[in-house]
Structures are given as structure tokens and as C-alpha cells.
Curated annotation (Swiss-Prot):
GO process terms (BP): neuron migration
Gene from which this protein is expressed: Cep85l
Descriptive protein name: Centrosomal protein of 85 kDa-like
Chain spans, region Disordered: 1-27, 51-89, 101-146, 308-353
Pfam families: CC4_CEP85 (PF24555)
Biased composition (Polar residues): 60-74, 322-351
Organism: Mus musculus
Stretches assigned to coiled coil: 442-644
Biological role: Plays an essential role in neuronal cell migration.
Superkingdom of the source species: Eukaryota
Keyword NADP: no
Disruption phenotype: Knockdown of the expression into neural stem cells of the mouse neocortex causes a neuronal migration defect.
């Protein structure tokens, strides 16, 4: 970066030579300080003196997480290389004015320095300046070793150390020690800076033309690369040991080394140096404190260095290198699917019916990582916009410097050749002469500087606001991530419960299927029912046979008992016979003993007795045989009687049923008889009344009654005679049925004889006929009473039989 001309107060009396000096701070290179007596040239540094120190210690976690909550070791990349030989031959001229030439560097390296300086209030400033020094002619590019591929978010920490100023600048140019001593001597007062500000404006015209051409070429060759990786740099307590307790606080410095603005393009026309920082307020030129305006400007430059965007345009800041485009496309393709899953289709992927393997939860976590990376890319782009604004500020500063340097024209090499030996001889004195610059031009530059400072302050405030917004968004995203993790864990639990429930349901289904498989079908049920009917019929048949066999067994038992009785009787007879035979044998023995004494008559008697006994025995055997035959005959008779008994039982059952029907008919008949009795009572009362009337007035009836009344009486008697005949027939039928006889069919069917019809045709109303009919009616009442008594007796007998059977 171009060194900024500082404008202290005019009046450089402390410097004897009257020349202005540049403080060897963060924005100034020693190339601006030419010698007084001889031409200074950039000496080439040998290849063995190149500082190419790479100190890289990174332990990245390959667990697949987003890097949040993990920390990696320090990653300090120090690339300080120099290559090629610098040849600078200043043009000679008669004008003896010092010139400030900007020498292009041929080195191509990516310089990343992390330095830390303490502010006066004790806070730590951790800044990261990534600069690129490249060959302008070749346009070589050297990228960091960490930018080879896309990786998830990592935490990087680098220790910024308080280091002393190095004796070698980052472009690899070594300057004489005398020049540095002269710088220290010339920086002891303010007039040196004012002399340099009012230095002749015509000396640097040629060099500024070269710078403009080189800037155009630089703007053509700008490109950017994209690497989605953060480096979280923090301070380590072991490396930074400060005596004061206030200096022990550590701050987290996030340097986005993976973003495009943190990887500047290597060009040979610009020399961006990363000087060593000192504490603001303690920087001095030769031990003298810097003015507040200078301190403000230096502080602004330090703020610009925290997140620099070096050598970028708006279009180039979002462009990708050719080798990174396919990786970016793959990353976008890989992150589109997670976005769809988590936004729209993630609710469908949680449907419980399938209940897939739990390995898919890992894919969901990877999807979340992809979302976080996309969020980080958006944040990076917003930070790129902020850095683009910083770039515009730097461009404005460059324009201001170019305008200031444009006034230094007609600067010849002869003056420089005359100045260099004078500068080398006068080591303790400053040999610059200050020429007065036009006051209005100086005021205009100061106004521009103030406006740029104001813009820088505004941009810094805006940057702080955006950083705070980004931090809040990051916290929100972390909270959302935690809630999503909790939600995922709850979903896992739910899935486990549902899987267990499904297993239980599956077990139940299997048991039900087994049960249904064991159940018989309709054909089986029908066949079993048929078998059951067949078995029932067989069972009935077997029961009947069993009953028959039991009956036969009882009969056989009875026969056996009878036979046993007979056998006992026969045994008794046999015993009697045996006793008689024994007695006879004894008698025979006695007879044999006394045979001499027995006469012949006794022998004949014994012979006859034996014959009788034999006859008796034969008759007894015949009797026994006859008795056995009788027993057999009786057994047959008993069997026949048993069959008859069964038949009689069946007939008895049928008769009982018939009797039940007859009882029902008898009940109906009794009801009819009661009704007839009531009617007969009424007729009797009417007949009694008529008989009394006839007896009282037997003669005057025919004379007094009119013809109409006689016909009515005839009709009444006719109907009464019909009722009397029917009642007689009914009483006779009931009596016959009660006695168990067959009823008279003519009476039952109501067939009347001719005599009855002849009697009915008679219209004799004589007292004899009336008395006869009255006697018939009385007889009918008696018959009805008898019938009632028989029916009641029969009913009482039936009730008694029913009670006995029950």
C-alpha cells in the first residue's frame, strides 16, 4: 500500500537539511527515503537468504460437524519470499531535487502476517494483513495451502506477537544500515515531515506515469477465489505474557482468510507491505511522539487492515477461479437438496409409516451443515461488500496520493546521483530541503483527507453495526440449530416409540393370523356337524341297546336267582338223599355184619326198598327235568309278558293323551251343561207359571186368548220340546262316554226318529200332555244332576291320579 504523506504543522527548524521524513510505521517503506549524496539502488537478495518460513499446525476435526464448538490449533502462515534481481537506474537530470521512486517487486508469495499490538488503554488489537507480492511480467499466482478445497467451518487461532521491526522489508529488498540511521536522525522533529510535504512536485512525474500504467494493468488482472472456510484466530495465554493484569485479556479475532478479499492477487507492480505494529500513541519518529492527526490516520489504516480487500474490483470479488468453479457447482448441488428437505419436504421425510433406518438422521445432520455453510456464504458475501467499500476508500487514498505525487515533476536522475553520496556522508543529518508548497493546495488536500477520514469513520461504524448484526444472526442460527437438534432428538424418541408400537402390532397380527389359521372353515364345520349328527344317532342307538341289555341283564339276574333257589332246593334234596343213602349203607353194613342172623325175608325187603329208592330217584330226576322245562317256559313267558308290558305302556300313554283330550271336551261340555241348566231353569220357571195359570183358569184360556197368543204359545212349546229332546240326547251321550261305552251315533249326529217328529206335529194342549212334558223335564233335571256328579267324580279321580304320578 502506498505510504501516506502526513501533514504536520509547518516550520521545520529542527531539521537542518529541511527535508521531510516518513515515519517508519505501518504504511511507509524505506524506498521513499533516498540518499543525499549517491544514488540508492535496490540490492538483490540471494536465494539462500529468502525468508520462506511456513509454520503451520492445524488439527482439523473430521467428525463431519460444522466446526461450531471445536477449536483447532494455531495456523500461522508466514510467507516472506523474494526472488529475482531488482535493477533500478534513476534518470539523471540537472535538477537537484530528491525523488521518491516506487520500485516494482518480482517476488511472488502470499504474505500473511498476524500481529498484535496493545492500545494505550490496555486492549489488544489483533489484525491480519494479507498481502501479495507478485511478478508483474509473469503474473504468477500463489495461493495458500489451506485454500485447496471446500471444507466446513473451522476455528483457527493464531497468536499475534509483539515483534520488533525487521531489518528486511517484505519485498525482499535490503537497504543499507546508514539509510535507516539517517531515517532515525531525520525523524526527530516535526520540521522534517513538513519539509518533505513541501518538497518539489516536479520530480516524481515520470515515476507517477509508470505507476498509473501499472495500476491499469493490475486492474485488468484482478481475480478472486472462493473458499468457504473461516479462521477464528484467538490469542493464547502461553504465548502472550504481559506483566500488567489488564493486558492478560484475550480477544477473539476472526480473520476470514478463506474469503476472496483475504486472498489478494499476486502482481509485480504493487508492493503491499505488512509492517510491524506498535501501540498507537507510542509510535514516534526518532523518539518524538506523533501528532494526534497522524495518530488518527494511522488508527484508520489499522482499522482498514483488520478485514482488507486488496486489489479487488466489484466484479472480480465475486468471481471464481476456473479450477474452483466445478467445486462450487458441486457444493451448490449438494446444498440444494438439503434446503428442499429442511424447508418443504422435510415434513414429508418424517412420516412414520415407513419408519426407515436411523442412519438417515445422520443425513439430516449433514443437511443442516449444508444450510449453515450456505448461511456462512451469505455472510461472507455481505462482508465482501463491506470490504469492497474499504477498497473504494483505498482507491480514493491512492488517487489522493497520485494527485499529490503529480506535482512532483521534472525530477531528474542527476539530482538523485548528486544526492546519494551526500546522504551517505552525512549519516546523522537530514539532507532534504523543503520547498514551500502552495497553501491553497495544502488546504484542499487537508480537506480531502478530513473527508476521507470521516468516510472511514462512518464505514467503521457501519462495519461494527454489520458485525454486531452478523454476531446476532449467528447466535440466532446457533439457537435454531439447538432447537432443531432437540426437535430431531424428540423425533428420534417418537420414531422409537412408534417402531415399538408397530412391533407389538405386528406380533398381535401374527398371533391373530395364527388363531385364524387354526379356526375351522365352513366345510370343516359342516363336516363336523354331519359327524356330530351321525355320532348322536349312534349314541342314541347305543343308549337304546344299553337299555335293552340292561333289561335283559335284569331278567337274566331274575332267572339266575330262580335257578339258584331251585339249586338250593335240589341240594337240600340231594343232601336228604345222601343221608338216606348213608343210612341205608349203614343198614346194609349192619345187615352184612348181621347177615348170618338176618333172614332171607329181610334181604328181600331191602331189595325192595332199594328198588323203591331207585324209582324215587328216577321220579325226582324227572321232576327236576320237568321243573327245568317249566322254568324255561316261564322265562319265555316273562319275556313275552315284558313285551306286552311295553305295548301296554305305549297304549297307556296314548290313553292318557286321549283322556287329556277327553277332559278338555268334558270341560267344554260342562260349560255347555251349565248354560243349558240355566236355560232349563228359566224354562222351568216359565212352565211353572204357565201351569199355575192353567190350573187357575183352565176353561177361560181358549176363550180369552186371542188367536195370535195361541200361535206364540204353540211355537214356544215346540221350541221347548226341541230343547228337551236335545238335552236328553246330550245327557245320554255323556253318560255313555263316562261309562266307557260307545255313544249313540244317531243321538250324536242329531238324527230324530219319526215318532218324535209325529209328536212334534201334535198341537195338543191338554193338561195331560202338559203334565207329561213337565214330568219329562223333571226327569231331565235329574239326569243332568247325575251327569254332573259323575263328571265331578271323574275329574276328582283324574286329579288324584295326576298327583300320584307327579
Amino acid at each position: 500500500m502506498w505510504g501516506r504523506f502526513l501533514a504536520p504543522e509547518a516550520g521545520g527548524r529542527d531539521s537542518p537539511s529541511g527535508a521531510r521524513s516518513f515515519p517508519a510505521g505501518s504504511d511507509y517503506s524505506s524506498a521513499w527515503l533516498p540518499g543525499n549524496e549517491s544514488l540508492w539502488q535496490a540490492t538483490a537478495v540471494p536465494s539462500n537468504h529468502r525468508n520462506n518460513h511456513l509454520r503451520r499446525h492445524s488439527i482439523t476435526s473430521d467428525s463431519g460437524d460444522t466446526g461450531i464448538g471445536t477449536s483447532c490449533s494455531d495456523s500461522v502462515e508466514d510467507h516472506s519470499t523474494s526472488s529475482g534481481t531488482l535493477s533500478f537506474k534513476p534518470s539523471r537530470s540537472l535538477v537537484t531535487l530528491p525523488t521518491a521512486h516506487v520500485m516494482p517487486s518480482n517476488s511472488s508469495a502470499s504474505v500473511s502476517k498476524h500481529r498484535e499490538s496493545l492500545t494505550p488503554d490496555g486492549s489488544k488489537w489483533s489484525t491480519s494483513l494479507m498481502q501479495t507480492l507478485g511478478d508483474h511480467s509473469r503474473g504468477e499466482r500463489d495461493s495458500s495451502l489451506d485454500m485447496k478445497d471446500f471444507r466446513p467451518l473451522r476455528k483457527w487461532s493464531s497468536l499475534s506477537k509483539l515483534t520488533a521491526p525487521d531489518t528486511r522489508n517484505h519485498s525482499g529488498i535490503a537497504y543499507p544500515q546508514e539509510l535507516r540511521n539517517s531515517l532515525e536522525m531525520t525523524g526527530k522533529g516535526k520540521p522534517f515531515m513538513s519539509h518533505l510535504r513541501t518538497f518539489g512536485p516536479s520530480c516524481l512525474h515520470d515515476s507517477m506515469e509508470l505507476l498509473k500504467l501499472e495500476d491499469k494493468e493490475i486492474n485488468k488482472k484482478r481475480s478472486s477465489t472462493l473458499d468457504c472456510k473461516y479462521k477464528f484466530e484467538s490469542c493464547n495465554k502461553e504465548d502472550v505474557r504481559v506483566s500488567s493484569s489488564a493486558l492478560r485479556r484475550q480477544t477473539l479475532d476472526m480473520t476470514y482468510s478463506a474469503l476472496p478479499e483475504s486472498k489478494p492477487i499476486v502482481t509485480g507492480s504493487e508492493t503491499f507491505e505488512s509492517p510491524k505494529y506498535l501501540m498507537l500513541g507510542q509510535q514516534a519518529v526518532g523518539g518524538v511522539p506523533i501528532q494526534p492527526s497522524v495518530r488518527t490516520q494511522m488508527w484508520l489504516t489499522e482499522q482498514l487492515r483488520t478485514n482488507p480487500l486488496e486489489g479487488r474490483t466489484t466484479d472480480d470479488s465475486y468471481s471464481l477461479a476456473p479450477w474452483q468453479q466445478p467445486q462450487t457447482e458441486e457444493f451448490q448441488q449438494g446444498s440444494e437438496t438439503p434446503m428442499q428437505v429442511l424447508t418443504g419436504s422435510s415434513r414429508q421425510s418424517y412420516s412414520p409409516p415407513g419408519f426407515q433406518d436411523f442412519s438417515k438422521w445422520e443425513s439430516v445432520l449433514k443437511i443442516k451443515e449444508g444450510l449453515l455453510r450456505q448461511k456462512e456464504i451469505v455472510i461472507d458475501r455481505q462482508k465482501q461488500q463491506i470490504n469492497h467499500l474499504h477498497e473504494r476508500i483505498r482507491d480514493n487514498e491512492l488517487r489522493a496520493q497520485h494527485a499529490m505525487l503529480g506535482h512532483y515533476v521534472n525530477c531528474e536522475d542527476s539530482y538523485v546521483s548528486n544526492l546519494q553520496p551526500q546522504y551517505e556522508s552525512s549519516s546523522g543529518q537530514s539532507l532534504f530541503t523543503e520547498q514551500p508548497l502552495s497553501h491553497p493546495h495544502q488546504e484542499e488536500l487537508e480537506q480531502k483527507l478530513a473527508s476521507t477520514e470521516k468516510e472511514v469513520l462512518q464505514l467503521n461504524e457501519f462495519l461494527k453495526q454489520r458485525i454486531s448484526q452478523f454476531s446476532e444472526e449467528k447466535k440466532k442460527l446457533e439457537e435454531k440449530l439447538k432447537t432443531r437438534d432437540r426437535y430431531i432428538s424428540s423425533l428420534k424418541k417418537k420414531c422409537q416409540k412408534e417402531s415399538e408400537q408397530n412391533k407389538e402390532k405386528q406380533r398381535r397380527i401374527e398371533t391373530l393370523e395364527k388363531y385364524l389359521a387354526d379356526l375351522p372353515t365352513l366345510d370343516d364345520v359342516q363336516s363336523q356337524s354331519l359327524q356330530l349328527q351321525v355320532l348322536e344317532e349312534k349314541n342314541k342307538n347305543l343308549q337304546e341297546t344299553l337299555i335293552d341289555t340292561e333289561k335283559q341283564l335284569e331278567e337274566i339276574k331274575k332267572q339266575c336267582q330262580d335257578k339258584e333257589v331251585q339249586l338250593l332246593c335240589q341240594k337240600k334234596k340231594e343232601k336228604e338223599l345222601v343221608t338216606s343213602v348213608q343210612s341205608l349203607q349203614q343198614k346194609v353194613e349192619k345187615c352184612l355184619e348181621d347177615g348170618i342172623r338176618l333172614p332171607m325175608l329181610d334181604a328181600k325187603q331191602l331189595q325192595s326198598e332199594n328198588d323203591n329208592l331207585r324209582e324215587q330217584n328216577a321220579t325226582a330226576s324227572k321232576i327236576i327235568e320237568s321243573q327245568q322245562d317249566e322254568i324255561n317256559r316261564m322265562i319265555l313267558e316273562i319275556q313275552s309278558m315284558q313285551g306286552k308290558l311295553c305295548e301296554e305302556k305305549l297304549t297307556a300313554r296314548s290313553t292318557v293323551e286321549e283322556l287329556g283330550r277327553k277332559e278338555g271336551s268334558l270341560q267344554r261340555l260342562t260349560e255347555a251343561l251349565l248354560e243349558n241348566q240355566r236355560q232349563m231353569g228359566e224354562t222351568y220357571s216359565l212352565l211353572d207359571q204357565g201351569h199355575e195359570a192353567e190350573q187357575s183358569r183352565p176353561q177361560t184360556i181358549h176363550s180369552k186368548w186371542p188367536l195370535f197368543d195361541l200361535t206364540v204359545i204353540d211355537q214356544l212349546f215346540k221350541e221347548m220340546s226341541y230343547c228337551l229332546f236335545d238335552l236328553k240326547a246330550l245327557c245320554s251321550i255323556l253318560n255313555q262316554r263316562a261309562q266307557g261305552k260307545e255313544p249313540n251315533l244317531s243321538l250324536l249326529l242329531g238324527i230324530r226318529s219319526m215318532n218324535c217328529s209325529a209328536e212334534e206335529t201334535e198341537n195338543d194342549h191338554s193338561p195331560e200332555t202338559l203334565t207329561k212334558k213337565l214330568s219329562d223335564v223333571c226327569q231331565l233335571r235329574r239326569d243332568i244332576d247325575e251327569l254332573r256328579t259323575t263328571i265331578s267324580d271323574r275329574y276328582a279321580q283324574d286329579m288324584g291320579d295326576n298327583c300320584v304320578t307327579q
